[in-house]
Amino acid sequence: VRPLLQEIYQDDPWKMLVCCILLNLTKRQQVDGIRHELFYKYPTEYEMIEADEDELSEILKPLGLYRKRAKTLIKFSWMWVNGFSDVMELYGIGQYARDSWEIFQMNNMDVKPTDKVLLAYLDIVN
């Protein structure tokens, strides 16, 4: 069984949340197909803020909704750098990312996610 992207990027919360954003309406296999190139070109939130939207869109193209995703990642990264008190304040963060944050960053295993993969993960670790 392959680890969740949240496990892979647990030590880099920004990358973990980027993956959660990309997984929205997208299969893991599709995200796996672009994440290495994405994080090679934009290894930190600071590079992402400076990203050329067209270049970023090209990397994201296989996922669909690539222009919207590019704008979302840039805005999310800008907000990340400028600080936040609750992860839900960040642009592009929905319930899946929030639940992932609670589980993998806050070590809160009492979360009740609606996502079946996160539910299965909690069943295994609890």
Listing of model-derived features with the role each one plays in the protein:
Residues 3-126:
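Catalytic cores of DNA base-excision repair glycosylases
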